[in-house]
Amino acid sequence: MAAPLLHTRLPGDAAASPSAVKMLGASRTGISNMRALENDFFNSPPRKTVQFGGTVTEVLLKYKTGETNDFELLKNQLLDPDIKDDQIINWLLEFRSSIMYLTKDFEQLISIILRLPWLNRSQTVVEEYLAFLGNLVSAQTVFLRPCLSMIASHFVPPRVIIKEGDVDVSDSDDEDDNLPANFDTSQSLANNSKICTIECYVHNLLRISVYFPTLRHEILELIIEKLLKLDVNASRQGIEDAEETANQTCGGTDSTEGLCNMGFAEAFLEPLWKKLQDPSNPAIIRQAAGNYIGSFLARAKFIPLMIREQRHSAMLLSMDHFTQPAKLCSTPLFLDTSSF
């Protein structure tokens, strides 16, 4: 809207009325406000261009051709410690429009953007920054890990730096004093976890191995490692109490008990047996698989006798195959398992 016209009173004119004086003051206030807005407009960077001219897209394309001057200016402006909210918004708008050009070649530029002080800014800056992160990880997935690391870093309390003059005396060395207590607390929480929590943990890991067979080996290693740690940290009295409770609650002659035990034993032994028989596996893997099979067959009381005989027969046939390659045994051998 244009400002109202102001007329200067000549000596021969009549004196201005009070209402006219009031209107004149309001008009002068409006002109002052417009001049302030005009100054802010010229002092702030434009919304769709960078401060040194051109666009971010042009700067990125020039950088790929070897012209690095504008690119260095761009980095310096982003590293300005006194950067304003409006400037951050302008930069983010520019980068969002150039998201397809921000490839892995501009990893250094992305690291500078991720260090921008955006969290304690205005709500507009926060929303614009989050929108930029969403566009970035959607179009350039190579930057997903740095973005997640940056977001996670804001959940960590800042380190306390103790200074004497210009010398850093300590960089939060006192934080290490709590490490033993924190470790003991975490260990006690893990050891005192409810049985149902551990069962759900193992069950979900095994379900993941069904959906991702390529991760089955690593998942089984993880499960065995965690179970061994629980077994080592468990007290003897706790183990005896758990076994006694299991005998009291799970005893009986349920018709489905044998079928469930048979399915579990087969599911556990079959992958190990394949590992043992595969000559392409390293010797240490095959040896470990054999050790697990032997330990399982010798110590698991719930394994049906039929499975024991089948596995012993298969192992004897395999041993005969390795010791006498020219004379394969044609009839299955059975081991007397009455002593087990």
Swiss-Prot record:
Molecular-function GO terms, alphabetical: RNA polymerase I core binding; RNA polymerase I general transcription initiation factor activity
Pfam families per the UniProt record, alphabetical: RRN3
InterPro entries linked to this entry: RNA_pol_I_trans_ini_fac_RRN3
Record-level GO cellular component terms: nucleus
BP GO terms, sorted: transcription initiation at RNA polymerase I promoter
Family: Belongs to the RRN3 family.
Protein name, as recorded: Putative RRN3-like protein RRN3P2
